[in-house]
Amino acid sequence: MPPKSRTATASRKPRRKEKKNVAHGHAHIKSTFNNTIVSITDPTGAVIAWASAGQVGFKGSRKSTPFAAQMAAEAAARRAQEHGMRKVDVFVKGPGSGRETAIRSLQATGLEVGAIQDVTPSPHNGCRPPKRRRV
């Protein structure tokens, strides 16, 4: 059996992702008690840019602050503007402290915010919640 030739795989260059030019999209802000994640997508739901408080450089309990959410939203908005994003509809999920701050910083970076919608899932008495924390 002849050895496999490696020339086919070695000559392959990694492809650069082409920039999508999307003028209108959705900003999904997931704000938990521990972190805030901002994903900016096109109208079909394909992610164009994202950032989280941990990715921006915050660690531990500082990730859950409103300032960390602000920095994450600014970073995601800047990346989305590189792809030509100008207008977003905002979908907010979760009970965290960075909800309003993230929306305000999206507006401050130059993105025009259209509709703001709260999509926090609430159970109709589904799963049993975790036990109370005793400190």
From Swiss-Prot:
GO terms for cellular component: ribonucleoprotein complex; ribosome. InterPro entries: Ribosomal_uS11, Ribosomal_uS11_bac-type, Ribosomal_uS11_CS, Ribosomal_uS11_sf. GO terms for molecular function: rRNA binding; structural constituent of ribosome. Pfam families: Ribosomal_S11 (PF00411). The keyword Ribonucleoprotein applies. Residues 1-10 have a biased composition (Polar residues). Residues 1-27, 114-135 are annotated as: Disordered. Residues 12-27 have a biased composition (Basic residues). GO terms for biological process: translation. Keywords: Ribonucleoprotein, Ribosomal protein, RNA-binding, rRNA-binding. Part of the 30S ribosomal subunit. Interacts with proteins S7 and S18. Binds to IF-3. Belongs to the universal ribosomal protein uS11 family. PANTHER family: 40S RIBOSOMAL PROTEIN S14/30S RIBOSOMAL PROTEIN S11. Located on the platform of the 30S subunit, it bridges several disparate RNA helices of the 16S rRNA. Forms part of the Shine-Dalgarno cleft in the 70S ribosome. This is Small ribosomal subunit protein uS11. It comes from Kineococcus radiotolerans (strain ATCC BAA-149 / DSM 14245 / SRS30216). The gene is rpsK.
